[in-house]
Amino acid sequence: MIGAAGAVAAGAALTPVVFAATDSDSGSQPEASGTTPEEFPTTRSDAATGAGTATTAFAASYVGVRWAGARDGAALRLPDGDWRTLSGGCATVDDGGTALVAAGSTTSYEVKAADGTTDVRSLAIDTTDGPRRTFKVPSEPTRVRGVRYQSRPAWGADESKRYKNGVVNSPEKYYALQTITVHHSDTPNGDADPAATVRAIYEYHAVTLDWGDIGYHFLIDEAGTVYEGRYSGDDNVPAFNSDGDLVTAFHTSGYNSGNLGIALLGTLTDQGPTDAAKASLVRLIKVISRFKGLDPQAKVTFTNPVNGVTKDVETVSGHRDWLETDCPGQTMYDLLTEVRAAAAR
Protein backbone atom coordinates (compact mmCIF):
# COMPACT_ATOMS: atom_id res chain seq x y z
CA MET A 1 0.00 0.00 0.00
CA ILE A 2 1.09 3.60 -0.54
CA GLY A 3 2.14 5.44 2.60
CA ALA A 4 2.00 9.15 3.31
CA ALA A 5 5.56 9.61 2.13
CA GLY A 6 4.86 7.79 -1.13
CA ALA A 7 6.69 4.62 -0.18
CA VAL A 8 5.26 1.22 -0.99
CA ALA A 9 5.66 -1.89 1.06
CA ALA A 10 8.38 -4.20 -0.18
CA GLY A 11 7.04 -6.70 -2.67
CA ALA A 12 3.86 -4.74 -3.38
CA ALA A 13 2.36 -5.53 -6.74
CA LEU A 14 2.92 -2.97 -9.47
CA THR A 15 -0.58 -3.01 -10.89
CA PRO A 16 -1.64 -0.52 -13.54
CA VAL A 17 -3.31 1.42 -10.70
CA VAL A 18 -0.03 1.85 -8.82
CA PHE A 19 2.78 1.63 -11.35
CA ALA A 20 1.49 3.15 -14.57
CA ALA A 21 -0.50 6.09 -13.25
CA THR A 22 -0.83 8.90 -15.79
CA ASP A 23 -0.62 11.59 -13.11
CA SER A 24 2.91 12.07 -11.83
CA ASP A 25 1.87 11.91 -8.17
CA SER A 26 -1.49 10.18 -8.19
CA GLY A 27 -1.99 6.50 -7.56
CA SER A 28 -5.33 6.51 -9.32
CA GLN A 29 -6.20 4.46 -12.38
CA PRO A 30 -5.38 6.36 -15.60
CA GLU A 31 -8.37 7.19 -17.71
CA ALA A 32 -8.78 5.07 -20.81
CA SER A 33 -7.41 6.83 -23.84
CA GLY A 34 -7.71 6.13 -27.53
CA THR A 35 -5.10 5.49 -30.15
CA THR A 36 -3.82 7.48 -33.08
CA PRO A 37 -2.57 5.89 -36.30
CA GLU A 38 1.11 6.61 -36.92
CA GLU A 39 3.37 5.36 -39.68
CA PHE A 40 6.80 3.82 -39.20
CA PRO A 41 9.15 2.30 -41.76
CA THR A 42 9.12 -1.48 -41.89
CA THR A 43 12.41 -2.88 -40.65
CA ARG A 44 14.22 -4.69 -43.45
CA SER A 45 17.00 -7.18 -42.84
CA ASP A 46 19.23 -9.39 -44.93
CA ALA A 47 21.06 -12.32 -43.33
CA ALA A 48 24.39 -13.82 -44.38
CA THR A 49 26.46 -16.71 -43.06
CA GLY A 50 30.20 -17.19 -42.92
CA ALA A 51 33.09 -14.80 -43.44
CA GLY A 52 33.55 -12.83 -46.64
CA THR A 53 31.73 -10.06 -48.49
CA ALA A 54 27.98 -9.65 -48.24
CA THR A 55 25.77 -7.37 -50.31
CA THR A 56 22.28 -6.11 -49.59
CA ALA A 57 19.36 -5.00 -51.73
CA PHE A 58 18.92 -1.89 -49.59
CA ALA A 59 21.03 0.66 -47.75
CA ALA A 60 21.72 -0.76 -44.29
CA SER A 61 22.05 1.49 -41.26
CA TYR A 62 23.42 -1.26 -38.99
CA VAL A 63 25.11 -4.64 -39.29
CA GLY A 64 24.76 -7.19 -36.51
CA VAL A 65 27.37 -9.95 -36.26
CA ARG A 66 27.38 -13.12 -34.15
CA TRP A 67 30.13 -15.74 -33.90
CA ALA A 68 31.29 -18.68 -31.78
CA GLY A 69 34.78 -18.95 -30.33
CA ALA A 70 36.94 -16.17 -28.93
CA ARG A 71 35.22 -13.00 -27.75
CA ASP A 72 37.51 -10.99 -30.05
CA GLY A 73 37.16 -13.46 -32.87
CA ALA A 74 35.75 -11.36 -35.72
CA ALA A 75 36.27 -8.12 -37.62
CA LEU A 76 34.12 -6.06 -39.98
CA ARG A 77 34.99 -3.65 -42.78
CA LEU A 78 32.68 -1.26 -44.59
CA PRO A 79 33.42 0.00 -48.13
CA ASP A 80 36.33 2.46 -48.15
CA GLY A 81 36.89 1.82 -44.46
CA ASP A 82 39.39 0.03 -42.26
CA TRP A 83 38.95 -3.27 -40.52
CA ARG A 84 37.20 -2.94 -37.16
CA THR A 85 37.84 -5.62 -34.57
CA LEU A 86 34.59 -6.74 -33.02
CA SER A 87 35.33 -7.30 -29.36
CA GLY A 88 31.75 -7.89 -28.34
CA GLY A 89 29.35 -5.08 -27.57
CA CYS A 90 26.79 -4.79 -24.80
CA ALA A 91 24.96 -7.95 -25.79
CA THR A 92 26.66 -11.02 -24.33
CA VAL A 93 26.33 -14.65 -25.34
CA ASP A 94 27.50 -17.87 -23.73
CA ASP A 95 30.04 -18.77 -26.41
CA GLY A 96 31.84 -16.26 -28.62
CA GLY A 97 30.83 -12.70 -29.25
CA THR A 98 28.37 -10.41 -30.91
CA ALA A 99 28.33 -6.79 -32.02
CA LEU A 100 25.98 -4.25 -33.57
CA VAL A 101 27.86 -1.85 -35.84
CA ALA A 102 26.57 1.41 -37.31
CA ALA A 103 26.95 1.13 -41.08
CA GLY A 104 25.82 4.52 -42.40
CA SER A 105 23.91 3.57 -45.54
CA THR A 106 26.03 0.75 -46.85
CA THR A 107 25.00 -1.82 -49.43
CA SER A 108 27.93 -4.13 -48.73
CA TYR A 109 30.29 -5.13 -45.94
CA GLU A 110 33.00 -7.70 -45.27
CA VAL A 111 33.39 -9.96 -42.25
CA LYS A 112 36.68 -11.62 -41.27
CA ALA A 113 36.97 -14.43 -38.74
CA ALA A 114 40.00 -15.22 -36.58
CA ASP A 115 41.45 -18.71 -36.31
CA GLY A 116 39.15 -20.89 -34.27
CA THR A 117 36.10 -18.72 -34.87
CA THR A 118 33.09 -20.61 -36.19
CA ASP A 119 29.41 -20.13 -36.95
CA VAL A 120 29.79 -16.55 -38.18
CA ARG A 121 26.43 -14.95 -38.94
CA SER A 122 25.58 -11.40 -39.90
CA LEU A 123 22.46 -9.35 -40.48
CA ALA A 124 22.21 -6.08 -42.42
CA ILE A 125 19.45 -3.93 -40.92
CA ASP A 126 17.52 -0.95 -42.30
CA THR A 127 15.08 0.77 -39.92
CA THR A 128 14.58 4.06 -41.77
CA ASP A 129 13.71 3.57 -45.45
CA GLY A 130 11.50 0.49 -45.63
CA PRO A 131 7.85 0.55 -46.73
CA ARG A 132 5.67 2.45 -44.30
CA ARG A 133 3.27 0.59 -42.04
CA THR A 134 0.69 1.95 -39.62
CA PHE A 135 0.73 1.38 -35.86
CA LYS A 136 -1.93 2.28 -33.31
CA VAL A 137 -0.11 4.60 -30.90
CA PRO A 138 -1.64 5.79 -27.59
CA SER A 139 -3.13 9.25 -28.09
CA GLU A 140 -2.14 10.39 -24.60
CA PRO A 141 1.36 10.30 -23.09
CA THR A 142 2.14 7.07 -21.26
CA ARG A 143 3.91 7.34 -17.93
CA VAL A 144 5.58 5.13 -15.38
CA ARG A 145 4.67 6.92 -12.16
CA GLY A 146 5.58 10.32 -13.54
CA VAL A 147 8.24 9.09 -15.98
CA ARG A 148 6.93 9.57 -19.48
CA TYR A 149 7.88 6.76 -21.84
CA GLN A 150 7.42 5.62 -25.41
CA SER A 151 5.39 2.42 -25.52
CA ARG A 152 6.35 -0.33 -27.94
CA PRO A 153 3.80 0.86 -30.54
CA ALA A 154 5.08 4.42 -30.12
CA TRP A 155 8.59 3.48 -31.28
CA GLY A 156 7.36 1.15 -34.01
CA ALA A 157 7.94 -2.31 -32.53
CA ASP A 158 6.87 -4.94 -35.05
CA GLU A 159 5.39 -7.59 -32.77
CA SER A 160 5.76 -10.26 -35.44
CA LYS A 161 9.50 -10.27 -34.63
CA ARG A 162 8.64 -12.00 -31.34
CA TYR A 163 7.35 -15.02 -33.25
CA LYS A 164 9.19 -17.86 -34.95
CA ASN A 165 7.39 -20.38 -37.13
CA GLY A 166 4.09 -19.02 -35.89
CA VAL A 167 4.75 -19.31 -32.14
CA VAL A 168 6.25 -16.94 -29.57
CA ASN A 169 10.02 -17.47 -29.70
CA SER A 170 10.64 -16.58 -26.04
CA PRO A 171 7.44 -16.96 -23.99
CA GLU A 172 7.16 -14.50 -21.12
CA LYS A 173 8.31 -15.72 -17.70
CA TYR A 174 8.05 -13.62 -14.55
CA TYR A 175 10.00 -13.49 -11.29
CA ALA A 176 10.34 -11.14 -8.33
CA LEU A 177 12.62 -8.15 -8.97
CA GLN A 178 15.97 -8.35 -7.16
CA THR A 179 18.37 -6.03 -8.97
CA ILE A 180 18.72 -3.34 -11.64
CA THR A 181 21.56 -3.43 -14.20
CA VAL A 182 22.70 -0.42 -16.24
CA HIS A 183 24.01 -0.79 -19.80
CA HIS A 184 25.00 1.34 -22.76
CA SER A 185 23.96 0.31 -26.25
CA ASP A 186 27.46 0.84 -27.72
CA THR A 187 25.88 2.66 -30.67
CA PRO A 188 26.92 6.11 -32.00
CA ASN A 189 26.49 9.23 -29.88
CA GLY A 190 24.60 12.22 -31.25
CA ASP A 191 21.91 9.92 -32.64
CA ALA A 192 19.55 11.83 -34.94
CA ASP A 193 16.90 9.08 -34.94
CA PRO A 194 17.01 7.18 -31.65
CA ALA A 195 13.69 5.38 -32.26
CA ALA A 196 15.21 3.88 -35.42
CA THR A 197 18.19 2.74 -33.34
CA VAL A 198 15.83 1.10 -30.84
CA ARG A 199 14.21 -0.74 -33.74
CA ALA A 200 17.65 -1.83 -34.96
CA ILE A 201 18.55 -3.17 -31.51
CA TYR A 202 15.21 -4.99 -31.45
CA GLU A 203 15.91 -6.61 -34.83
CA TYR A 204 19.46 -7.50 -33.78
CA HIS A 205 18.40 -9.07 -30.50
CA ALA A 206 15.22 -10.76 -31.72
CA VAL A 207 16.53 -12.06 -35.06
CA THR A 208 20.35 -12.11 -35.18
CA LEU A 209 20.72 -13.40 -31.62
CA ASP A 210 17.44 -15.34 -31.78
CA TRP A 211 16.26 -14.00 -28.41
CA GLY A 212 12.78 -13.33 -29.71
CA ASP A 213 12.63 -9.76 -28.38
CA ILE A 214 14.71 -6.76 -27.40
CA GLY A 215 17.00 -7.61 -24.50
CA TYR A 216 16.40 -4.61 -22.21
CA HIS A 217 13.37 -3.66 -20.14
CA PHE A 218 13.88 0.06 -20.81
CA LEU A 219 16.10 2.20 -23.04
CA ILE A 220 16.91 5.91 -22.65
CA ASP A 221 18.08 8.24 -25.42
CA GLU A 222 20.21 11.37 -25.15
CA ALA A 223 17.15 13.62 -24.90
CA GLY A 224 16.04 11.65 -21.85
CA THR A 225 13.22 9.86 -23.63
CA VAL A 226 12.46 6.48 -22.07
CA TYR A 227 11.46 3.57 -24.34
CA GLU A 228 9.57 0.47 -23.26
CA GLY A 229 11.67 -2.59 -24.01
CA ARG A 230 10.90 -6.27 -23.52
CA TYR A 231 7.24 -7.18 -24.08
CA SER A 232 5.61 -7.98 -20.73
CA GLY A 233 1.96 -8.62 -21.60
CA ASP A 234 -1.18 -6.73 -22.51
CA ASP A 235 -1.89 -5.15 -19.12
CA ASN A 236 -0.27 -1.77 -19.95
CA VAL A 237 2.38 -2.23 -17.26
CA PRO A 238 5.87 -1.99 -18.82
CA ALA A 239 8.41 -4.60 -17.70
CA PHE A 240 6.09 -6.15 -15.10
CA ASN A 241 2.93 -8.23 -15.04
CA SER A 242 -0.13 -7.17 -13.07
CA ASP A 243 1.09 -9.20 -10.07
CA GLY A 244 4.23 -7.06 -9.88
CA ASP A 245 6.69 -9.66 -11.14
CA LEU A 246 9.38 -8.78 -13.67
CA VAL A 247 9.35 -10.32 -17.13
CA THR A 248 12.64 -12.04 -17.91
CA ALA A 249 14.64 -10.23 -20.58
CA PHE A 250 18.03 -10.97 -22.16
CA HIS A 251 20.54 -8.31 -21.08
CA THR A 252 22.87 -10.21 -18.70
CA SER A 253 23.51 -13.78 -19.80
CA GLY A 254 22.97 -16.27 -16.98
CA TYR A 255 21.55 -13.66 -14.60
CA ASN A 256 18.41 -12.39 -16.31
CA SER A 257 15.52 -13.65 -14.20
CA GLY A 258 14.66 -11.02 -11.57
CA ASN A 259 17.21 -8.58 -13.03
CA LEU A 260 15.87 -5.41 -14.69
CA GLY A 261 18.00 -3.99 -17.52
CA ILE A 262 18.15 -0.32 -18.51
CA ALA A 263 20.25 0.68 -21.55
CA LEU A 264 21.37 4.21 -22.31
CA LEU A 265 21.69 4.75 -26.05
CA GLY A 266 25.18 5.69 -27.14
CA THR A 267 28.77 4.79 -26.30
CA LEU A 268 29.67 5.94 -22.79
CA THR A 269 33.29 4.88 -22.66
CA ASP A 270 35.02 8.25 -23.06
CA GLN A 271 32.04 10.49 -22.43
CA GLY A 272 29.19 10.34 -19.98
CA PRO A 273 25.46 10.45 -20.57
CA THR A 274 23.74 13.74 -21.23
CA ASP A 275 22.18 15.48 -18.25
CA ALA A 276 18.74 14.59 -19.62
CA ALA A 277 19.60 10.90 -19.99
CA LYS A 278 21.12 10.72 -16.51
CA ALA A 279 18.09 12.46 -14.98
CA SER A 280 15.74 9.97 -16.63
CA LEU A 281 17.91 7.06 -15.48
CA VAL A 282 17.85 8.30 -11.88
CA ARG A 283 14.12 8.93 -11.96
CA LEU A 284 13.35 5.51 -13.42
CA ILE A 285 15.54 3.70 -10.89
CA LYS A 286 14.01 5.73 -8.06
CA VAL A 287 10.45 4.94 -9.13
CA ILE A 288 11.04 1.22 -9.59
CA SER A 289 13.07 0.92 -6.38
CA ARG A 290 10.44 2.71 -4.33
CA PHE A 291 7.58 0.60 -5.58
CA LYS A 292 9.43 -2.69 -5.21
CA GLY A 293 11.11 -1.97 -1.89
CA LEU A 294 14.70 -1.87 -3.19
CA ASP A 295 17.47 0.24 -1.66
CA PRO A 296 19.50 1.65 -4.61
CA GLN A 297 22.57 2.01 -2.37
CA ALA A 298 22.50 -1.48 -0.88
CA LYS A 299 24.36 -4.63 -1.81
CA VAL A 300 22.42 -7.83 -2.39
CA THR A 301 23.02 -11.49 -3.00
CA PHE A 302 21.27 -12.15 -6.27
CA THR A 303 19.82 -15.65 -6.51
CA ASN A 304 18.85 -16.86 -9.95
CA PRO A 305 15.35 -18.26 -9.39
CA VAL A 306 15.78 -20.68 -12.29
CA ASN A 307 18.98 -22.49 -11.32
CA GLY A 308 19.90 -21.21 -7.85
CA VAL A 309 23.19 -19.57 -8.93
CA THR A 310 24.09 -16.67 -6.63
CA LYS A 311 26.19 -13.53 -7.03
CA ASP A 312 26.95 -10.63 -4.67
CA VAL A 313 26.31 -7.33 -6.44
CA GLU A 314 25.13 -3.79 -5.87
CA THR A 315 21.35 -3.41 -6.06
CA VAL A 316 22.05 -1.03 -8.96
CA SER A 317 25.01 -2.44 -10.86
CA GLY A 318 26.75 -2.13 -14.20
CA HIS A 319 26.78 -4.90 -16.79
CA ARG A 320 30.52 -5.45 -16.19
CA ASP A 321 29.78 -6.36 -12.56
CA TRP A 322 28.20 -9.55 -13.85
CA LEU A 323 30.20 -10.56 -16.92
CA GLU A 324 33.35 -9.84 -18.90
CA THR A 325 32.34 -6.75 -20.87
CA ASP A 326 33.18 -3.05 -21.11
CA CYS A 327 29.49 -2.21 -20.75
CA PRO A 328 28.15 0.29 -19.63
CA GLY A 329 31.32 2.13 -20.63
CA GLN A 330 33.96 3.37 -18.18
CA THR A 331 32.57 6.90 -17.85
CA MET A 332 29.04 5.67 -17.15
CA TYR A 333 30.33 3.03 -14.77
CA ASP A 334 32.19 5.68 -12.79
CA LEU A 335 28.93 7.60 -12.38
CA LEU A 336 26.97 4.73 -10.85
CA THR A 337 27.77 5.74 -7.26
CA GLU A 338 26.28 9.16 -7.98
CA VAL A 339 23.26 7.58 -9.70
CA ARG A 340 22.63 5.28 -6.73
CA ALA A 341 22.77 8.16 -4.26
CA ALA A 342 20.44 10.33 -6.34
CA ALA A 343 17.96 7.48 -6.79
CA ALA A 344 17.92 6.85 -3.04
CA ARG A 345 16.97 10.45 -2.17
Give the positions of each predicted feature:
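Carboxylate/His-rich catalytic cores and anion/metal-binding grooves
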Residues: 212-215, 226
